[in-house]
Amino acid sequence: MNAIIFDLDGTLLDTRDDILAAFGKAFEGLGIPAPPPQKLVSVIGKRLEDCFAVFLDDDEARSAEGARLFRSWYADHYRDRTRPYPGVEEALARLASRHRLAVCTMKKGIYARALVDSFGWGPLFRSVLGSEEGFPAKPDPAMLLELCRRLDVEPEGVLYVGDTSLDAEMARRAGASFAFAAYGYGSLENQPVQVVLSSPEDLSVLGST
């Protein structure tokens, strides 16, 4: 394995509370009750407009407005209660000494990089790629393939770590291996998995994968 590329939400960081709060503010702005938390958590990892479309009968205009309201509130609150999962910082420090590391997330890059830097992880990652940089949404493999290019590695030598079926499908389409963060927010839909991580502390096994 030449490189390990990570999703962010539900994989390295527990962003649940801040994301749910932003959803709550957005649905309040739309004038309708927010769906139950477990249903909101189930869409984390999708493009934001697609998240709202799930709950708004695919109404594009209202979904776009929901995404706008979400982003407006989240811009000032994305770090209120977001924290690394236990064991992540130690695992990243060890893995960075042996592998090229990067982040591939549907979170906007400006927030992803700010969060990475705020926890002192900037020097550990060769690149952090977010959703606003002209690439199609997961599971299209374009973002992952771009990171392979930046890291100067072939996809076959990459392990992608994520917590959703979209992550697994993106890795499959790119030709990369996949490690499923089962402690995160999502689930799998029969996609191939090379490693299953039951808890954040299990990230430490990736160095020997």
Protein language model regions, located:
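Short helix-capping segments at alpha-helix termini
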Residues: 28-33, 59-61, 98, 120-124, ...
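Hydrophobic residues in well-ordered beta-strands that form the structural core
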Residues: 14, 103-105, 180
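Short, acidic loop-to-helix structural element flanking the phosphoryl-transfer center
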Residues: 76-103, 109-114, 141
